[in-house]
Amino acid sequence: LSINLNKVLTFERSGGKTIFKQLHFLLGGKVMSGNKEFFYRRLHSLLGVIPVGLFLIQHLVVNHFATNGPEAFNKAAHFMEQLPFRYALELFVIFLPLIYHAVYGVYIAFTAQNNTSRFSYLRNWLFRLQRISGIITLIFVSWHVWETRIQAQLGAEVNYDMMANILSSPFMLGFYIVGVLSTIFHFANGLWSFAVSWGITVSPRSQRISTYVTLGIFIALSYVGLRAIFAFV
């Protein structure tokens, strides 16, 4: 930016001091707005891993108990229901972080720019898939909460039979397969972005290694998730 000091001084002496201050305020406001945007994105990234991502892993592990039969799953589900301060944990550790991550994620999905037309490498396509999987995950999680947590508040019992009844429909079985895989992909691919944005993987080599690690996480969790789904069928 090139500034002519004589013109600035002339501008201020000629009565432009107030306007100059207003311009400075607006520029400062823009910087502050940028700082807020940076903070919101960092918070979105952090909450996607801690606690939302950790809850996803825990939820998949609990569901995987269904592979050992109805009794094993019901026992694991009952254990989770008996946790101390359960409702406070659900509100502050799960639902509020999840709502923020989802709402701000939708904002990012509809405002971020695609680079796939200019750059054809894998990472840009994964960036696009991250946004698509986020929307699918939001739809799936919202429906899953309605079918389980909301129904539980209305008097239904969350147990093996509930999930078996839901997944007895071929449509719902397909919906859950797509939803679970989208959710796991969104988490695993999000880990890659998290590591980059938080300065954990800076070099190209570390980012390549991170790609393989997150791919392994996606495969491992997908195996757990799909086994759990078919255990109810």
Say what each PLM segment does.
Residues 3-5, 20-233:
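Membrane-embedded alpha-helical bundles that constitute the cytochrome b-like, heme-associated redox core
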